[in-house]
């Protein structure tokens, strides 16, 4: 069995080598010739899996993407060819949630305000949106969910309209990219909405770049009343609109979901689906594959107010480090993908156990491991 995987996918050999030959190839430049004798294909969001790519893949039986989004996969072609498909929904939801909270704490420090009591419109209440909402609520933020598809499907949570969500102090986007239908998300935030927003609002996008009209956003940012922006995703990656970067407060190269746990979890979910599809027993456990974090234990002697929480959170992950690297390198050719490929190891908050006798409800809700309370 020949298993072709994206060169940047972790754990591929550890999880799949027992089933056949694991061949790593660059995801963004993958060719039909490389899949000519492949049985299994495992990709990330940079690979467009379509009829052209699969034109020579006569042996292909299974395609998996280690991502939440599937807009890079032509599912109709896979169905037509009888190729089984799986994705990794929720694999990096914790990582994205922690990215957003880290960014909001940076903004609160930069502009001298408290997050508690502010309103947050979460556009898209799936895995990542829910993870953001849960963590924001733990900080005392009033969360308003907007997801017409989930609302129509009978989700029991309370929802608001898109227009109401856009009135919030903070607005975070967590929708998949779709270009057709009543609730298409391509340019969901278009010129009309961008121009109507208040200059003191903070907007965050860690979903897909095309959800925001980047050109219209640049025009707004060049006006007398720019918005406050946190951008992890961009239109036309990796050839992004470089002119927009200086007008953002936080800018990163599509790495919100790039915690070590998130990356490992994505590949592991494909391993589980592969085993189920082909009748193999799942013999490996994700926890056994994760290394011990460099910072894995802390003792806390203070109550967890917003200042203490910020210090703890940024000790584990401070988004400003990614922002600084991005601004330093983005003008160089090919650096967008290179920064993603060589992204430094980042751990989730659950990798740290905090010993404390204080009330640590917020820490538990945020995802830290807590002992002693």
Swiss-Prot record:
- What pathway annotation does it carry? Cofactor biosynthesis; pyridoxine 5'-phosphate biosynthesis; pyridoxine 5'-phosphate from D-erythrose 4-phosphate: step 2/5
User: Binding of NAD(+): at which residues?
Assistant: 147, 206-208, 232, 257
Q: Matching Gene3D superfamilies, A to Z?
A: 3.30.1370.170, NAD(P)-binding Rossmann-like Domain
Provide this UniProt record's keywords sorted from A to Z.
Cytoplasm, NAD, Oxidoreductase, Pyridoxine biosynthesis
EC number of this enzyme: 1.1.1.290
**Where is it predominantly found?**
cytoplasm
Q: How does it assemble?
A: Homodimer.
Q: What does this protein do?
A: Catalyzes the oxidation of erythronate-4-phosphate to 3-hydroxy-2-oxo-4-phosphonooxybutanoate.
Protein name according to UniProt: Erythronate-4-phosphate dehydrogenase
Which species expresses this protein natively?
Answer: Tolumonas auensis (strain DSM 9187 / NBRC 110442 / TA 4)
Q: Encoded by which gene?
A: pdxB
